[in-house]
Amino acid sequence: MQLFHLCLIISCTCPTFQASKLCLGWLWGMDIDPYKEFGATVELLSFLPSDFFPSVRDLXDTASALYREALESPEHCSPHHTALRQAILCWGKLMTLATWVGNNLEDPASRDLVVNYVNTNMGLKIRQLLWFHISCLTFGRETVLEYLVSFGVWIRTPPAYRPPNAPILSTLPETTVVRRRDRGRSPRRRTPSPRRRRSQSPRRRRSQSRESQC
């Protein structure tokens, strides 16, 4: 909490620091869950190890390459686009704060404490947030939630009773589609519909009657 109060004092004296209170409160460990409205939780994201998430720069470049037009548009495209835009903006403001702290704090220990905290703890939260919304836009929210649950079950299962490799997000849509197709087609192949039987019998009778007339 001393670090939190220190950064609040610094942010009040820094004219360029405009990050939202919601983003700041969540990043500093307050009781705010940014995933709740999207059907996920912070705990669900925490099952993924820290080295699973790419760097903030790589995630920001991916978001810009895939969704630049929607992110730069003043219109509201979707909740995921808006959350992604705010996360990128928040990280930029935090980098401005870290730079300002590094240039203005006289105490080297306090300066290093703030800068390291921003780059490690807060950086991980931003990486998780960016990955979640980019994945939801790319693969669909239901697929991402299914992946998080599958990975959570896999990581909590003892190694002797689980597959050697963790689930892969990009393979979940194919598996889901195959399951739906198999379930939908199998009853049709086994038994024909009764309506077809009834519709075929009058046609056969008519054809037989025509042959007898000829």
Swiss-Prot record:
Signal peptide: 1-19
PTM characteristics: Phosphorylated. Cleaved by host furin.
InterPro entries in the cross-refs: Hepatitis_B_virus_capsid_N (IPR013195), Hepatitis_core (IPR002006), Viral_capsid_core_dom_sf_HBV (IPR036459)
Keywords: Disulfide bond, Host nucleus, Host-virus interaction, Repeat, Secreted, Signal, Viral immunoevasion
GO MF: DNA binding; RNA binding; structural molecule activity
Annotated propeptide span(s): 186-214
Location in the cell: Secreted; Host nucleus
Pfam families membership: Hep_core_N, Hepatitis_core
Superkingdom as given in the UniProt entry: Viruses
Marked site: Cleavage: 185-186
Main location: secreted
Disordered, as annotated region: 165-214
Region (HBEAG): 25-27
GO biological process, one term: viral penetration into host nucleus
One GO CC term, this protein: host cell
Function: May regulate immune response to the intracellular capsid in acting as a T-cell tolerogen, by having an immunoregulatory effect which prevents destruction of infected cells by cytotoxic T-cells. This immune regulation may predispose to chronicity during perinatal infections and prevent severe liver injury during adult infections.
Family: Belongs to the orthohepadnavirus precore antigen family.
Protein name in UniProt: External core antigen
Organism expressing this protein natively: Hepatitis B virus genotype A1 subtype adw (isolate Philippines/pFDW294/1988) (HBV-A)
